[in-house]
Design a protein with these regions (language model features):
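Conserved functional hotspots at enzyme active or ligand-binding sites that engage polyanionic ligands
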Residues: 1-116
């Protein structure tokens, strides 16, 4: 598999907040392309299909019927959670499901989350 790029939606074993358990789920690659940190890892944001997680400025909702969600490979209504980030080793990424065509709303959510 080629290295995932910023904006790719990937299937990955995403660590839970307790750092003891994890769940295979989609996630969005946030890390800039060509970061060249010397480490084989990628910064990602969790994607949830739980509608109760929507409605916060740190989160971006994607309706399953939208062209955005279809391009990203998301079959369910989904929420990109920029307030739930993880750094994972590249080998933990199973596959690229698709690509989010426009990162503008996600970038705004990241700025809100990190006070940038």
């Amino acid at each position: 598999m080629t290295k995932p790029r910023r904006g790719d939606v990937v299937l990955v074993l995403f660590p839970n907040s307790d750092l003891r358990t994890a769940k295979r789920r989609p996630a969005l690659v946030l890390q800039r392309d060509g970061l060249a940190s010397g480490l084989p890892q990628i910064v990602i944001a969790m994607i949830s299909s739980n509608p109760l997680r929507a409605g916060h400025p740190s989160r971006v909702s994607l309706a399953a019927a939208s062209s955005e969600a279809r391009a990203a490979g998301l079959r369910l209504d989904s929420i990109v959670m920029t307030d739930n980030l993880a750094t994972v080793i590249e080998t933990e990424i199973d596959s690229v499901l698709g690509r989010l065509p426009d990162m503008g709303r996600v970038d705004a959510a990241v700025r809100h989350t990190l006070a940038l």
